[in-house]
Swiss-Prot record:
Residues 81-176 form the Toprim domain. Belongs to the RecR family. GO terms for molecular function: DNA binding; zinc ion binding. May play a role in DNA repair. It seems to be involved in an RecBC-independent recombinational process of DNA repair. It may act with RecF and RecO. This is Recombination protein RecR. Keywords: DNA damage, DNA recombination, DNA repair, Metal-binding, Zinc, Zinc-finger. A zinc finger (C4-type) spans 57-72. It holds the Pfam family Toprim_4. One of its GO terms (biological process) is DNA repair. InterPro entries: DNA_Rcmb_RecR, Rcmb_RecR, Rcmb_RecR_Znf, TOPRIM_dom, TOPRIM_RecR.
Length: 201
């Protein structure tokens, strides 16, 4: 069965969302058209405004409507000499929710991937190098994902930081809290063993 051109365009547009296939997009489109036109209009308006108004923080590259994001504008954060480097804005939220980190961030918006044509400049590493050169950071925490690409990106940034005499640390990877060893995969267990630390009593 063929849908009207506009209905088909709506379905195709919804398929751009991650994890949304043809069937899911069709259900969403029908839900908006049949039962929630007001919600659909609000979604369309908010989406249009977000696409126009949301950009990147000039300092950390996180999403913001201002020149600097809320974290970079914080007087307490401005005094910090610790920089945490993450791949996505979602990683910033995850770390902030722990309540354990009070430094600054740098959001790469991805990771190095030569196959996909993503190089250092695409991740803003030229901006990062300039920040290292100012001497404002005493430590950089590499919080990229424990994937092949994430590790390659961390290694590249570590070499960059080393050129500017910045101390480098990497977030620990290992056994999840509440997990049982027999169910942990070999790579994770290997990371946990190599990253072990002394036990404090």
């Amino acid at each position: 069965m063929k849908f009207s051109p506009l209905v088909q365009e709506l379905i195709d547009s919804l398929k751009c969302l991650p994890g949304v296939g043809a069937k899911s997009a069709q259900r969403m489109a029908f839900q908006l058209l049949e039962r929630n036109r007001r919600g659909g209009s609000k979604l369309a308006n908010t989406l249009a405004k977000a696409m126009t108004d949301i950009g990147h923080c000039q300092q950390c590259r996180n999403f913001t409507e201002e020149a600097l994001c809320e974290i970079c504008q914080s007087p307490k954060r401005q005094l910090s000499t610790t920089l945490c480097i993450v791949e996505t804005p979602g990683d910033v939220i995850a770390i902030e929710q722990t309540g354990e980190f009070f430094g600054k961030y740098f959001v790469l918006m991805g990771h190095l991937s030569p196959i996909d044509g993503i190089g250092p400049d695409d991740l803003g590493l030229d901006i990062l190098a300039k920040q290292f050169a100012t001497g404002q950071f005493s430590e950089v925490i590499l919080a990229t994902n424990p994937t092949v690409e994430g590790e390659a990106t961390a290694h590249f940034i570590a070499e960059l930081a080393q050129q500017h005499q910045v101390n480098i640390s990497r977030i620990a990877h290992g056994v999840p809290v509440g997990g049982e060893l027999e169910y942990v995969d070999g790579n994770t267990l290997s990371h946990a063993l190599s990253g072990r630390k002394s036990y404090q009593i």
